[in-house]
Amino acid sequence: MLESANVLCDCWRMEIDAFGFEHTYRALPEQFYARREPTAVDGPRLFALNKELATRLRLPLPTLVAHGAQIFSGNQLPPDAQPIALAYAGHQFGGFVPQLGDGRALLIGELVDCEGRRRDLQLKGAGPTPFSRRGDGRAALGPVMREYLVSEAMHALGIPTTRALAAVTTGESVVREEVLPGAVLTRVAASHLRVGTFEYFAAQSDWPSVEQLARYAIDRHYPELNGSDRPFLGLLKGVAERQAALVADWMKVGFIHGVMNTDNSSISGETIDYGPCAFMDAYDPKTVFSAIDRSGRYAFSNQPDIAQWNLARLAETLLPLIDSDLEKAVEAAREVIQNMLPDFEGKWLANMRAKIGLQTEHATDRALVEELLEIMHRCGADFTQTFRRLCDATQAAEMPSATGERFGLSSEYDAWALRWKQRLAMEKTTVAEQSDLMRRSNPARIPRNHRIEEAIQAAVLADDFGPFQRLGAALCEPYRESEEYREFEIPPTEAQRVRRTFCGT
């Protein structure tokens, strides 16, 4: 099989054209990365190709369709690819690890998309690198499928995220807790700059590299800071604002990242490294899915505090750049860090107002939202479907109590619903406009954990990717109700409920 694959590669080498890759990160000094070619695999097979994203990246679709298995497995890269593994450190569950880096991923190049935005292309699972730490550098099929489905679902939900361009099976096995099929994911990101990237150089007191990295981050993600009197303080503020908005968006849809280490905290403000991520079914602010998060550090309700903690770690790396006077630098950074949670609270409350049909601000809004969440928690109400069914409850023809019964909520809902209706009456919008706002703010479908597991099991056990394709299609338009995909709106039964998720590394 390997021989025939090599023959295909030899024939194909004459056909492949350059993709138009650029390499601004590779132009940095070599302490920022390690050069490494992908490790070839025996029998790659393309099982997912994101044609919409490929078109946005101005990639040649006929080439991807014909030769995607070879390209996206890393067996045969475009001639202008220059693969590198990025160096970074990170705080993992609060403990500092001075060297992590891309242990199984290779950045093969950057593309400027049709909107003029620079995007990284990375192969995840492409083989060992100098940062693999005795790992095999490979990815299992299940985690690749999970990241593909969830990252694309997050994009459809309107939440900043890395995206999935393609996924291939490798024809080889990987050994984790058990022997599993191998796979490679092609990830697209605004960049792969992380808080941990800054920590890597700061831990070595390599301040020239920290400054070089900070200037690169500003040029790429915060160009408005060029020419600013205090660009590095501005960088810290920019990251704080984007991370506050990102976590507020996560919590709007019940998303739990699961492993918010600083090496998984993006400077661009995107969701990155999905690992043991999951969406809540029944609302519980203390929900934890990750099997390795035994203390609940990254529970749903802890995410804003963890984002602030991660920001403080970034601030520590930037202090010498913010001001030559350490006391002044600390004071300036502290103000940014302290402002992050109030900023998050404002963004979160704005999101929650929209979820219950409100556009204007009122002093009682927070209490109104929190009371509903408390009722949902006590009753074990499904987070997604409760808010989606509230869209119907704005219609005058439906009594609040009928809506409450539909969710399985207690009689407490009736009293809350009356106060909610009174608050809606204070708005200048019509009932139809309120309902429309809610339908744009409350998805009908999310990537429910049991549905993802069903798709993974079908692929792993029976080589059946039909459930994966169908689930992916159902998640493309999450705010539009569809009879065709009604099954994906239904919460899991007790027997179907997924209680633990895994990183897959």
Residues covered by each model-derived region:
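ATP-dependent phospho-/nucleotidyl transfer catalytic cores
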Residues: 143-144, 173-257, 268-374
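Hydrophobic residue at the +6 position relative to the catalytic HRD Asp in the kinase catalytic loop
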Residues: 260-265
